[in-house]
Design a protein with these regions (language model features):
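N-terminal DNA-binding recognition helix of tyrosine site-specific recombinases/integrases
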Residues: 4-7, 69-72, 77-82, 96-129, ...
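Basic/aromatic-enriched alpha-helical hairpins
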Residues: 22-97
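Basic, Lys/Arg- and aromatic-enriched nucleic-acid-binding interface segment
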Residues: 105, 125-180
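C-terminal catalytic core of Y-nucleophile DNA break-rejoin enzymes
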Residues: 139, 205-251
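Catalytic-site neighborhood detector that most strongly recognizes the C-terminal catalytic loop/helix
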Residues: 144, 204-208, 289, 293-314
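C-terminal catalytic core of tyrosine-transesterase DNA break-rejoin enzymes
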Residues: 171, 175, 181-182, 268-295, ...
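Conserved tyrosine-mediated DNA breakage-rejoining catalytic core shared by Y-recombinases
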Residues: 176, 185-224
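C-terminal secondary-structure termini that scaffold catalytic or DNA-interacting sites
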Residues: 315-339
């Protein structure tokens, strides 16, 4: 009995050593009191931390994905293995697997989240590997559709019913800016009438922000035109999984001769870009999309070449109407404050 207890204590001590933590008497006492598991690896800890967290399921799924990639790189990972050199090696592994810079950055952020959890009791703070490691990220390009491409999608002939359904749902979100997750949760209760006009009210799944959309004022009520072709929003919003929807969208892009890589989220980028192209204030676009920061909206928006030409022509017309120097007797010095 005593021998088994000594082995148990030695196991706890070994577990602390693997985590890079000196096994002090107080730590051993605390571990015995809490009946801590012996020799818990980082991989086991991370899986348990994810499963028992109160994070959203989508966040948990992302963390589990990174954990699976980490397992492929090095299985049975211990806490003491988590060093700056390990992070560099993992980054190189991801590069060699053909991952883009921003995909690598996403995995490294997920790993950092798990390491931050481990620091709370499973790793020594001095062993924190992300202290010197900098996560590299590139400014991403947000794909969007221009009006001509939207027109092609609106007019393309689609015989397959499921593909037609996906196309209608995609176009609905091009004209409302909804995320896939928000669109799929819509019910008839989300639609209300104000002064006889239909508005869409919902709370974002991702952010919890309440969003109100006057559908009659967005893109000549095109979203309402699509909605009216279905018995109710429940029929339109009943989409297959995101990956299947994206597969159908790639087929549709091919039918229309659109070379861009279309995913469902392109509809949101398209909405933001076209609203700004129409001259809608970016702060209004922010509210319509439900962004908590206008900086996020600025990232989504793109300036079309036609917008630049339009704005410059407008400025040119204004200059013709206004005489910049109506009084020829004025000199340059007259514009200088000599105080």
């Amino acid at each position: 009995m005593l021998y088994e207890y000594i082995l148990y204590l030695q196991g706890i001590e070994l577990g602390y050593w693997k985590r890079g933590i000196p096994a002090t008497l107080s730590l051993l006492k605390d571990a015995v009191k809490k009946k801590s598991a012996v020799n818990v690896s980082f991989s086991i800890f991370a899986k348990s931390a994810i499963d028992n967290s109160d994070k959203k399921q989508s966040t948990k799924d992302n963390l589990h994905t990174t954990l699976a990639v980490l397992h492929d790189f090095r299985s049975g990972l211990d806490f003491k293995d988590l060093t700056y050199t390990f992070l560099r090696d993992f980054e190189q592994y991801l590069k060699e697997k053909g991952n883009a810079v921003n995909t690598i950055a996403k995995h490294m952020r997920q790993l950092r989240t798990l390491v931050n959890e481990a620091i709370k009791g499973y790793m020594h703070a001095n062993a924190y590997p992300f202290r010197k490691y900098k996560i590299k990220q590139e400014k991403g390009r947000h794909e969007f559709l221009i009006p001509d491409e939207l027109k092609k999608l609106e007019t393309v002939e689609v015989e397959e019913e499921s593909m037609r359904h996906v196309l209608d749902a995609f176009l609905f979100c091009c004209y409302t800016g909804l995320r896939y997750s928000d669109f799929c949760q819509l019910t008839p209760e989300n639609f209300i009438r104000i002064n006889g006009k239909r508005w869409l009210y919902f709370k974002s799944v991702k952010t919890g922000v309440e969003i109100r959309l006057p559908l009659h004022l967005l893109f000549e009520s095109r979203a309402l035109g699509i909605l009216d072709r279905y018995p109710d929003i429940g029929s339109l919003a009943a989409l297959p999984c995101n990956s299947e929807v994206n597969r159908q969208l790639r087929k549709l892009a091919g039918l229309c001769g659109i070379k861009k890589r279309i995913t469902y989220h392109v509809s949101r980028h398209t909405c933001a870009t076209l609203l700004i192209h129409q001259g809608v204030a970016i702060t209004t676009v922010q509210k319509l999309l439900g962004h908590t920061s206008v900086k996020t909206t600025q990232i989504y928006s793109e300036i079309l070449s036609s917008t630049i030409v339009r704005d410059l022509k407008n400025a040119q017309r204004k200059r013709r109407k206004v005489k910049i120097f109506p009084d020829k007797s004025l000199r340059t010095s007259d514009f200088i404050d000599n105080r």
